[in-house]
UniProtKB/Swiss-Prot annotation:
This is ATP-dependent protease ATPase subunit HslU. Disulfide bonds: none annotated. NCBIfam families: hslU (TIGR00390), PRK05201.1 (NF003544). GO terms for biological process: protein unfolding; proteolysis involved in protein catabolic process. GO terms for cellular component: HslUV protease complex.
Amino acid sequence: MSEMTPPQIVSELDKFIIGQEKAKRAVSIALRNRWRRMQLNSELRYEVTPKNILMIGPTGVGKTEIARRLAKLADSPFIKVEATKFTEVGYVGKEVDSIIRDLTDAAIKMIRIKNIKKNKVRVEEIVEEKILDVLVPTPKKNWTESEKNESLAKTIQTFRKKLREGVLDEKEIEINILSTTMGVEIMAPPGMEELTNQLQSLFQNLGGHKKSSRRLKIKDAIVLLTEEEAAKLINQEEIKKEAINAVEQNGIVFIDEIDKICRRGDSSGPDISREGVQRDLLPLVEGCTVSTKHGMVKTDHILFIASGAFQTSTPSDLIPELQGRLPIKVELQALTIDDFEKILTEPTASITAQYKALMETEGVYINFTKEGIRNIAEAAWKVNESIENIGARRLHTVLEKLMEDISFNASDNKGNTIEINSNYVEEHLDQLTSNEDLGRFIL
């Protein structure tokens, strides 16, 4: 797992997310506490449970982006789910237990990739030798032993050099590789994904592990042989054991749109997609044991981070038991014009940098002036205020409208530099921001 300190985590998040310091601090402390807990003795470690987080804020302010970036920093099993996809146990739809099954599958994949990387050098050596065995002919029988060895060594070195330089990539060779059985696609109702996976595994294993001779280009043969040899060096049972332990000790679940499963005060009758889902989530968040195809997984020490806009409801509309299991509540602020301006320029791979790079592929060079950036930010903020506040996502809509003519006529402007200044922005966005009805239609 990641050993980054809270300031380091916040610093990394700052590269992609503008503002929202409280939320960044909360998730960075929670992530660091995962590492701190692992340094304790086993008896005390069991008693220390994670403090789950509820992030509250309007749409488009960075809740989901924080989770997405946190997943890359965590180096721990991580899964993001939408609360609206689940229904109460006994009804058609995904059950909440599938969250832990999916998290375990993600952990298996993560541990498997780590093991493959660990064995990368060894696998490359084995694959190289197998390719050379096919490429290098056997010396003639009437040669002396020393002549054979000398000739063989020279030939092998020659081919090894060419192979490493990629000179032989297009050359075709005949090799024996494991034959893959025909894939079987099984359609199943929601909530029966586990059974579907088991049936697919059964059909895939029916063909056994037979080898077949295939004629392939060397570059394609290397890919197939690498997969085959990497699989041989992996102990599947050890991976399962390690993955389950990683999930139980360091797993992180991000539940988005949790406000959509709040039961409104004026509703009546059974509510299978709201309060029932909350009650099903309780055992997971509090700690229970879930059965997966890889083994039993305990959820006692999994960190849950929930988020929601709560525009038509409030956190108090969640059932009290669930509120109590999300003790850390962080409010994210609505974005200002200054925030929009920073979002356009400061993050790594900012929106403006993306548009510049896209246009440069056609030889068109875009230059955004400081005044132009400010005008774009003001336009996005104005549309948000007058129509519907969708946060930073509005910038994509505004910039797409602004760049429409340039994108359409890019091939005619090859070699030109186009400056997007205050006048250009006003000319192309003035009608959009001044006419509310037109704005509603376009956006």
